[in-house]
């Protein structure tokens, strides 16, 4: 044992001596090196740094393992104070790790709600058309305010979309211009839109100026640089992308099985060198020229011939054989590989064409990924597994393909078909972050009609909206509230309004009746109204304008609303049948008086007709049933300009409601029975409401059609040839077998 102890002591002593010799040698070499530098500095009259620099710098070997936010230049930070270090780290945190909780001032939004201020455009500043469309969408939205003191969010008027220094759209000296804005406040509560950042050869995501604490609404943003719950990933869109409206998706009908001529297609540039070239250079391995057609061309850029390889000529020849549009509309899947940047125009093109996108862009934060579940509309691939893509998509079941295709159409029409929808979706996402207690859930964002038309301020319960009864396993309401719009004084007990009130009150589904008194004369005495089995509430309109009939009155206690003009002639049986039909289509307008629209080629404008034809696109609200949520949507979604037009003309409110409901549902209204309800000339000439007999009334409705279509950016009305009649309607059977037998006698 004693021998072992001696050996152990000797070994320990030797190890200690070796370590002392090693560190002493390092210090001696550092000292000699310092002495030489000191002599050299003395000869040149230079002052030498502190002796702290003599010590060996062991952390250098560990530098690759230091977190990025702690990596500093030690030479420049050795002498800074602890407070300066904290300030430096704080600055990094605010810029790189910003979240809503740390870099956004919520107090501005609590005062006046979610209002957005766009800086006024400065003289001499060039603004690309795409950015002008973004600003126009903001200024035309219900969020816009021209008063910065009322604003919760600020958007620059300086064009930040294209930050590629080689682009003609690049705005120079943006750093100083932004810093000079008196409301900038280091970017706090600011939103910056950007489509292109960086330039050849690395295409970094740097926008070229210090954004401070501003949020980014950015295309082609990587998951590495994306700040969750702060930035918003938007799609890359072209300068030709429509400002409003936009074309609908190209899926006109569902084919079963949902397979097309091509299984997988792509046609685009092949980058011979540089970033983004790896994947596109390898596409030829997957191309089979039959159902998998992946075409690339080398012909792009000024010096492509300098870099051309042995495959270029063959690829270029094959590329010219196929028409891109024909491939796009006849393919089941469309490959969306990355380009120089992560995003690609092919993404939106595939969505619109109902071609399921196969994403091949590792690290791309997909557009609006915070709210959209892309697994329901796309196949997320991996660039490293390119050769497995064909077998992967072939294994997808046909039911799944059909569901993916339908979801592409919904997402395209709900969020991507226009610049306005992209901007409004961005703003709605930010608003949901601010007011989390009334924010939309994933079901709202990913199911028809989408987040832009479902306003959570109306209700936080999905059962209060007409779109989710099936999802929640609920039945539509079993009662309705009749709202009668009265504009003429009550002078006789035989007036149509009193007969209408009695007929509606006798319905087994009627919960109450509200009379909206928009007449200039005082309210009639209570005894003038007939006695009914249901409550009758008379509301005197404050402004007595046409739009007041669609206000979301608290007195309406049911989800279903039976909207009636005072001159409407309906029986109780007709009311019951219409409500029964509506319960099967609670998201649509169901009623009696039908009208239609058409395109007048000679005048190049939309026309309105009340002629009895084989189709219709509107059901007027003088005798119709719909969900009361549309009152809220009419009041809070539509711009004041359209409602003011309706009020000034005392006309077109029913047309505007049809535009709104069709825009939301993407479906036509439903007409019941063949009865022709009142025409435009039925109203008596002695009434203040003789607007129906006014020759200018019809011309005004023509004008309204075009104004409304202009605001929506497209014509949302949809023609229908469907009319619903009672079972056995006019069949040669016993009248006792018919439930709604009185309808045949009318």
UniProtKB/Swiss-Prot annotation:
The chain crosses the membrane at residues 8-28. Disulfide bonds join 98-103, 109-152, 298-312, 334-355, 652-704. GO terms for cellular component: catalytic complex; endoplasmic reticulum; endoplasmic reticulum membrane; Golgi apparatus; Golgi membrane. It is found in: Golgi apparatus membrane; Golgi apparatus, cis-Golgi network membrane; Endoplasmic reticulum membrane. It catalyses: 3-O-{alpha-D-GlcNAc-[(1->4)-beta-D-GlcA-(1->4)-alpha-D-GlcNAc](n)-(1->4)-beta-D-GlcA-(1->3)-beta-D-Gal-(1->3)-beta-D-Gal-(1->4)-beta-D-Xyl}-L-seryl-[protein] + UDP-alpha-D-glucuronate = 3-O-{[(1->4)-beta-D-GlcA-(1->4)-alpha-D-GlcNAc](n+1)-(1->4)-beta-D-GlcA-(1->3)-beta-D-Gal-(1->3)-beta-D-Gal-(1->4)-beta-D-Xyl}-L-seryl-[protein] + UDP + H(+). N-glycosylated. Its EC number is 2.4.1.225. Residues 1-7 are cytoplasmic. SUPFAM superfamilies: Nucleotide-diphospho-sugar transferases. GO terms for biological process: heparan sulfate proteoglycan biosynthetic process; protein glycosylation. Pathway: Protein modification; protein glycosylation. InterPro entries: Exostosin, Exostosin_GT47, GT64_dom, Nucleotide-diphossugar_trans. Part of the heparan sulfate polymerase, a dimeric complex composed of EXT1 and EXT2. Could also form homooligomeric complexes. Interacts with NDST1. Belongs to the glycosyltransferase 47 family. This is Exostosin-1. It comes from Pongo abelii. The gene is EXT1.
């Amino acid at each position: 044992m004693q021998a072992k102890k001696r050996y152990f002591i000797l070994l320990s002593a030797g190890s200690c001596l070796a370590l002392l010799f090693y560190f002493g040698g390092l210090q001696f070499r550092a000292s000699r090196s310092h002495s030489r530098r000191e002599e050299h500095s003395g000869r040149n009259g230079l002052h030498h740094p502190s002796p702290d620099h003599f010590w060996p710098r062991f952390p250098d070997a560990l530098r690759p393992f230091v977190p990025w936010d702690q990596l500093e230049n030690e030479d420049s930070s050795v002498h800074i104070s602890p407070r300066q270090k904290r300030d430096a780290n704080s600055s990094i945190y605010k810029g790189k790790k910003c979240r809503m909780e740390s870099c956004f001032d919520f107090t501005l939004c609590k005062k006046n709600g979610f209002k957005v201020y766009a800086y006024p455009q400065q003289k001499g500043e060039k603004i690309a058309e795409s950015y002008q469309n973004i600003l126009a969408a903001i200024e035309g939205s219900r969020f816009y305010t021209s008063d910065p003191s009322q604003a919760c969010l600020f958007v620059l008027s300086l064009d930040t979309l294209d930050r590629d220094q080689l682009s003609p759209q690049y705005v120079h000296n943006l750093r100083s211009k932004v810093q000079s804005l008196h409301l900038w406040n280091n970017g706090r509560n600011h939103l910056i839109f950007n489509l292109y950042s960086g330039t050849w050869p690395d295409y970094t995501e740097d926008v070229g100026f210090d954004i401070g604490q501003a949020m980014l609404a950015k295309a082609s943003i990587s998951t590495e640089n994306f700040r969750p719950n702060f930035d918003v990933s938007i799609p890359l869109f072209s300068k030709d992308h429509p400002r409003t409206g936009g074309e609908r998706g190209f899926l006109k009908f569902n084919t079963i099985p949902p397979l097309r001529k091509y299984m997988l297609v792509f046609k685009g540039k092949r980058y011979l060198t540089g970033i983004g070239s790896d994947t596109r250079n390898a596409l030829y391995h997957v191309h089979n020229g039959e159902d998998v057609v992946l075409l690339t061309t080398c012909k792009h850029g000024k010096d492509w011939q300098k870099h051309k390889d042995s495959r270029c000529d063959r690829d270029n020849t094959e590329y010219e054989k196929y028409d891109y549009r024909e491939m796009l509309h006849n393919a089941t899947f469309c490959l969306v590989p990355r380009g120089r940047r992560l995003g690609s125009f092919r993404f939106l093109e595939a969505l619109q064409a109902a071609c399921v996108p196969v994403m091949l862009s590792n690290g791309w934060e997909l557009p609006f990924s915070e709210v959209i579940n892309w697994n329901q509309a796309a196949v997320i691939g991996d660039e490293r597994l390119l050769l497995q893509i064909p077998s992967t998509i072939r294994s997808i079941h046909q039911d799944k393909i059909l569901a993916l295709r339908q979801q592409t159409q919904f997402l395209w029409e709900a969020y991507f078909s226009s610049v306005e929808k992209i901007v409004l979706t961005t703003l709605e996402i930010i608003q949901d972050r601010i007011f989390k207690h009334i924010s939309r859930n994933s079901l709202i964002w990913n199911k028809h009609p989408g987040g832009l038309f479902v306003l959570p301020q109306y209700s936080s319960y999905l059962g209060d909206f007409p779109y989710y009864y099936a999802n929640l396993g609920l039945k539509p309401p079993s009662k309705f509230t009749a709202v009668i719009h009265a504009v003429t004084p009550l002078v006789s007990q035989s007036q149509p309004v009193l007969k209408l009130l009695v007929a509606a009150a006798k319905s087994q589904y009627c919960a109450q009746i509200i009379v909206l008194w928009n007449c200039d004369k005082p309210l009639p005495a209570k005894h003038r109204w007939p006695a009914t089995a249901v409550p009758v509430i008379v509301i005197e309109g404050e402004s007595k304008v046409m739009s007041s009939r669609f206000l979301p009155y608290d007195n309406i206690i049911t989800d279903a609303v039976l909207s009636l003009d005072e001159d409407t002639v309906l029986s109780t049986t007709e009311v019951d049948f219409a409500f029964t039909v509506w319960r099967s289509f609670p998201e649509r307008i169901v009623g009696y008086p039908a009208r239609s629209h058409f395109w007048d080629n000679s005048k190049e404008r939309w026309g309105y007709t009340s002629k009895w034809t084989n189709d219709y696109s509107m059901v007027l609200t003088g005798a119709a049933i719909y969900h009361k949520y549309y009152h809220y949507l009419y009041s809070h979604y539509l711009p004041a300009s359209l409602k003011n037009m309706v009020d000034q003309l005392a006309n077109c409110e029913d047309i505007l409601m049809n535009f709104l409901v069709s825009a939301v549902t993407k479906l036509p209204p439903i007409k019941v029975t063949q009865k022709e309800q009142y025409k435009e000339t039925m109203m008596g000439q002695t009434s203040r409401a003789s607007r129906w007999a006014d020759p200018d009334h019809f011309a005004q409705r023509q004008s309204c059609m075009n104004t409304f279509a202009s605001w929506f950016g497209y014509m949302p009305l949809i023609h229908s040839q469907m009319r619903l009649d009672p079972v056995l309607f006019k069949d040669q059977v016993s009248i006792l077998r018919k439930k709604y037998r009185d309808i045949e006698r009318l």
